[in-house]
Amino acid sequence: ISRTAENFGYGQDLKIPLAVAKSSFPKGMSQSQLAQASVGQYDVRTTPLQVAMTSAAIANGGVQMKPNMIRSVKTSNLSVLYEFSPEKLRTSTSTKVADQVKQWMVNSVDNGIASGAGVSGVKVAGKTGTAEIGTTGLNNSWFTGFAPADDPKIAIAVVYEDIDVSTGAKLSTNAGKQLFEAVLNK
């Protein structure tokens, strides 16, 4: 599990011209710690950017791309001065594994807890997640996904912090749906 996390960039600095927090996946864990870490507990640290990049890699057949904060630079009359080209960062997993995970993510939106992220007429791939954050009974609620699943145009990650489980899942999937609809003009 640690090697897979590293393959998706956990514990590595993102080389982008912006200060961002580094995600981490602990090493040298006991079996019980590894079990907790495998579902995002124990001492796993991540950011919405890292989670969105992971979903984007699944959408892209296992290839993770370097994130860009802007697509192009335009002049005052809106002609393109410079356009950034997509740049491969790493191969995170095989196409076979990425395709299987994609199928599971589509099923999670079509038939599972992530159904709130569904967009009419669009096949959406997504996954919810809940991270316990202490003894308060509150959690961090996540949704990540991409759409359209068969020809991805957008990959996202949404997190609501310090929230109860049922409210968090509803809010995070609804926010995902709204992002998909806005970008895909639905």
Give a label for each model feature.
Residues 80-82, 173-186:
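Short, gly/Ser/Thr-rich active-site loops of penicillin-recognizing serine hydrolases
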Residues 95, 99, 170-177:
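Short, well-ordered alpha-helical segments
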Residues 160-174:
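A short acidic/glycine-rich loop-to-helix N-cap element
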